[in-house]
Amino acid sequence: MKGKLIGDILVVKKEPEDLDEIIKLPYINKVVKLGKIHGQKREPDVEMIYGEGTETVHKENYCKFKFDVARIMWSKGNTGERLRMSTLPESDETIIDMFAGIGYFTIPMAVHSKPKKIYAIEINPVSYNYLCENVKLNKVEDIVEPILGDCGLQDFDHVADRIMMGYIGGTHHYLDSAMKYLKPGGIIHYHESTPEVILFERPVQRVQMAAEKVGRSIEVLNKRSIKKYSPGVHHTVLDIKVN
């Protein structure tokens, strides 16, 4: 069976030859063919092969994520990073998730680490609505405050112990805002799509430049490649302490 299972939906790149057998499986209620992804909102072309509707609830690491696979991206390749982030925060932390989406990182952190507060910012209204639903679905309303808007235009002033920047499309443009939001000694988890030849050099330089502009210094705590994003390009993440 080729494809990836998201909730009760089997997502495929082409119609399976063994479709009759697949739809007999009790955990598959729908089969969806996704085509090219395009636009700033990263929405794919969709063809319904079996079943009705493209909304599902996906379970991972004791968390529930409700979303529409036709309108929202779900990357299996980021599973390890979601698991890692779920255990890093301390219980007294205030966290800002600048690119919250449907709660990819916010929900695991809230469910497993139970920090004091997570401000989860999302600019896409569709993703924001699912974020709000997922906060309720996982019963973390007392921890997570969803915010609809531009993460670069918020009023936070050095309130965050930890900042999530889990987006790879021009994330560096928001580093100045992250510096404004982050407390001295706070940590930024900075994601970027980076060519192999400058795999960690470029993201480190970008964070360092943003810090130096406001008289701050950085300490790189961890750096890793999450996955290959495209030929010669990696999805990288850096954990950086900003003093």
Report each predicted region and the residues it spans:
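SAM-dependent transferase fold signal centered on methyltransferase-like domains
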Residues: 1-243
